[in-house]
Amino acid sequence: MFDAGDRGGGGGVVAVKRMKLCEEEEEEEEGMEVDEEEEEVGWVWRPPGGLAGEDEAAAWEGRAAAIVVSDAVEVDFPVIYVNAAFEAATGYRADEVLGRNCRFLQFRDPRAQRRHPLVDPMVVSEIRRCLNEGIEFQGELLNFRKDGAPLYNRLRLIPMHGDDGFVTHVIGIQLFSEANIDLSNVSYPVYKQQSNHRPNIQEINPASHEHIPKIQSSEYCCILQLSDEVLAHNILSRLSPRDVASIGSVCTRMHELTKNDHLRKMVCQNAWGRDVTVRLEMSTKMLGWGRLARELTTLEAASWRKFTVGGRVEPSRCNFSACAVGNRLVLFGGEGVNMQPMDDTFVLNLESAKPEWRRVKVSASPPGRWGHTLSWLNGSWLVVFGGCGQQGLLNDVFVLDLDAKQPTWREVASEGPPLPRSWHSSCTLDGSKLVVSGGCTESGVLLSDTFLLDLTKEKPAWKEIPTSWSPPSRLGHTLSVFGKTKLFMFGGLAKSGSLRLRSCDAYTMDAGEDSPQWRQLATTGFPSIGPPPRLDHVAVSLPCGRIIIFGGSIAGLHSPSQLFLLDPAEEKPTWRILNVPGQPPKFAWGHSTCVVGGTRVLVLGGHTGEEWILNELHELCLASRPDEDE
């Protein structure tokens, strides 16, 4: 829960919004329409994940939303306002509710001491987590009227911030509907958190233990006496997805707990990070967290497919750079005819019924370039760095908000920039910090430095990450993020004495440490099982922290489409080969490959001679597509 300390300063803002709520309620009762300005305040209900179709939309249309306001400054979020729709839906009068926490709706009887066993503890835990973090919650929860009748509550909790940035109030928007459920059908017993009764195994699951002699209570596993909420929120959610799946086979109760999708989401969120799970939720939609965690862990559903898209990227080009923004692919720049640097931007919306390339009309563009990097930042922002322009190599930084009404490339004035370069590698940390590594200078010298630029600063300044040792200078390598703050470098054309050779070495650095250091990974595996030396290849960072390597420029007869998997966090990292069915691309290059939503790897086209075919895409699907089950 939020700290109940002194957080004054925001009450006036929320008080005005509470008055707006009251005014809107009175207008509704009098049959008056609310104008557009008042509708934009944000009190319109939108179900989690959107409505499934017109029938469902019609079912909810016109239903009055129950509104509750709680004080986040006081202990336990006491209710300070309810509207008439709440009173009508729940049977509780306002004077019976004000000053209490809204959890009483989880009790079937007003005199009950704890919530009903059919109330999903994982949803309750998710609500608590969102309140603790001051973020919005959307979900469905079983509630009860004052007379004990069950209701489904489609709930949306919106935190309101004061002028000082602290959460001062929480708005609850609720849509209640009748729940036709058997309240006596409890799939597993839920014990009180404080209980002197120690049940034996027969009492836990009598049907499956009819012929087993009674076991003394002293031999009963104490952990099973914990409440479902404690087991889910404090223990199971902190384990890895693989461990949770294993625990689900222990007994019936654990099976029921671990198959819950809210728990699975908490497990994935704690293991992979909130930003990753948000992207996965947007891209995989109704796949389910249990199935998604299994498929991303085992890669059992991985497959290649080929498809075509419309539109054209003209003039034709090579050596461009591409990245993904949500479910959109963005392409910038490239090398045209007679080594002409290009400065245009194209986008491909994969959510469209018929995806096609279209040129983005921008009011200003960076100087044309090729051999640069294009990286995704938070939201709909992109960042371009370096490359080879009309007048030589560059070290400038430009950002673009793809969702702006008038998209404009804006140059970021930054202090202490690194040397101008091309064929370097870059990635982003926390969606806001640009990391640049290596590359080649104007004179052809290979670089081994690593720079960081925090784009959230009012005056961004480049900072070289000082290390006591650096990997050999190189270009055409990859730089990936795993474990939130850790960097993984692989391959490239590296300096080896007086020679420049393709590399298959791997290095890691934890940028979150006080003194980050590069460390070479001592990888293991059967002879010849690791990826052959290469440059300009593809490195895919999976949500679970593992890395997939394929493609690039490889010496000899090795196949660029062969996939190699490595977990750099293992005590002894070991390369493994992935055999994936489907139609892989003949060639794949790092600058023209994008990762969409954490589960889709898009390789842009092939090429005939010098001409790239950007209407042909190969997709490596790391998880099942929801439409495959239809």
From Swiss-Prot:
InterPro entries: F-box-like_dom_sf, F-box_dom, Gal_Oxase/kelch_b-propeller, Kelch-typ_b-propeller, Kelch_2, PAS, PAS-like_dom_sf
Database matches in SUPFAM superfamilies: F-box domain (SSF81383), Galactose oxidase, central domain (SSF50965), PYP-like sensor domain (PAS domain) (SSF55785)
Pathway the protein acts in: Protein modification; protein ubiquitination
Family listed: Belongs to the ADAGIO family.
Single GO molecular function: photoreceptor activity
Keywords from the named record: Biological rhythms, Chromophore, Flavoprotein, FMN, Kelch repeat, Nucleus, Photoreceptor protein, Receptor, Repeat, Sensory transduction, Ubl conjugation pathway
Function: Component of an E3 ubiquitin ligase complex that plays a central role in blue light-dependent circadian cycles. Acts as a blue light photoreceptor, due to the presence of FMN, that mediates light-regulated protein degradation of critical clock components by targeting them to the proteasome complex. The SCF(ADO3) E3 ubiquitin ligase complex is involved in the regulation of circadian clock-dependent processes including transition to flowering time, hypocotyl elongation, cotyledons and leaf movement rhythms.
CDD domains: PAS
Subcellular location: Nucleus
Organism: Oryza sativa subsp. japonica (Rice)
GO biological-process terms attached to the record: circadian rhythm; negative regulation of cellulose biosynthetic process; positive regulation of flower development; protein ubiquitination; regulation of DNA-templated transcription; response to blue light
Miscellaneous note of the record: 'Adagio' means slowly in Italian.
Domain PAS positions: 54-126
Any one cellular-component term (Gene Ontology): nucleus
The protein's name in its UniProt record: Adagio-like protein 3
Kelch repeats by residue range: 380-430, 432-483, 485-537, 545-597, 599-629
NCBIfam families: sensory_box
